[in-house]
Structure formats: C-alpha cells, structure tokens
Amino acid sequence: MNIENEKNVEIKVAGIGKTANNALNEIIKAVEADFVAVSEKQENLDLSEAGIKILVAEDFEKKIQKALENTDMLFILAETDEAENVKISTAVAKIAQSLDILTISIIAAPSEAEFAKTGKAELKQFADIVITVPTEKISEEINKIFIKNIKVIEDIIRERGIVNLDFADVNSMLKNGGTAVLGYGTAAGENKEEVVVKQVLNEILEKSIKNARKILMNILAGPEIGLDELSKITRILEKELETDEASIVWAYAMKPDMEGTVSITLIATDFS
C-alpha cells in the first residue's frame, strides 16, 4: 500500500442550504477536505468560509460539475428545514454519479417520514450511501453530528495503523450501498469487547444492523489488545447479524494513550 497516495485521496464536502452552509464553517476546522457551499440565497454563501461557493441558478449544474472534477469521494450535507435542499442534493449526487465519485449523503431530518416526503427515494437513486440524522432523537448540535459522520469514514482512509484499509477497500464496501447507519462506542475494563459492541448497537437510532450485508469498522485500542481480542469483537458483531452473507471489514490502529480501552466506529450498509 502506498500511504502517501491514501493521504492524497481527494475528498470534497458539499453543504446544501443555510444549515449545512453554516456547519461547513465548523467542519473546515476538523476535516481534511475541500469544501463547497451551495445555496439558493446569496446571503448564505456570503457567510460561508468554503473555498467554493455556488449559487443555485441557471449555470448551477455546470459549476457543480467543474467543482467536482478530480474528486474521489463526496459528502453531501443538508437539512430538510428548507424545502428544496434534498432536491438540490439529488442534483449534485446525480452529477457526482456521472463522474463515478463515491457519494455519501448525510441528511438531517426530524424523522424518516419527513425525509421521505422531501425526496429520499430520489436521492437514493444517485447517492451511493444515504445516512439519516434523526434530529428529533438527538441532543447534539447538527454541526457535531455532521463532523462525526464524516470523520468515521475519513479516519478509516487516512489514519495509518496496524491493519489498514485503503480507498479501494472503502469504495468497494460503500459503492451502491443504499441506506447506511453509523454507530460509535468506547469501553474499558473487563469484558470491554462485549461492552463496546453493545454501545455501538445502542448508539444506532435509525435502524437495526441485523440485515446489513456490509459492515465497515474502525477500531482504536491500547497496546494490550491483540488479535484474539480483535477477533472477539468481530465474532460478537457477527452474532448480531441475521445473514451469513455479511462482509465485515475492519481497520485497527494502536494508541499508546488508550491502554485498557477500546473504541469502535462502525458503518453498516447494503441492507437486505
């Protein structure tokens, strides 16, 4: 594996509408990517710190296509608070699909029902992955949720550990994955492997992972964790699945400052 190439995977984050435009100003500080702000209102763009700003107008699609040139992975962020946001997200995802860009849409909505009304089915036709952030069920700020979701995938690609996944691995797992859910967990002490998996599963609010056929996982742990413990985590996770066809792919990085602790981030997709 060429580590330098993995660092140079071209990632872009597009924020659609006022809420996502505002979120970009925080995400810029936390994520290694290029940023595109898209809005129907010039005043939203004027407040954005994104390097590329695109007003939804007659030449919108041409500008999006140019902005997405030479991109490997695209995150599309939006909230359903503005009626056209999901439609605009779909237009961006369609262009990304035509350029063979791995496209992950993260949409904040009060509920799945609300998201469905604003065009989830149409978006799923063009985005490889669609993640719903159920704003009625969470207390965290939307900005932090967006960052957390992006970092799960970015860290798997960019962070170098003992067991590494590269962009090709991530692309094969997420391409045409459909609906996806994410979970996070950290545990220490006895039985931490069981505890951390339970935490991850409890964190997932939108959907059970039981029918997921693809699971991408990033594990961080202290130096005492060995192959037996890593295999145990995978076995515990496999017991939660109802299909024998599931593929679980994971990366592992050892952190000296995490002695006695294990942390997992997980994305499950390709639901049967």
Where in the sequence are the language-model features?
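Tubulin/FtsZ superfamily GTPase core signature
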Residues: 1-272
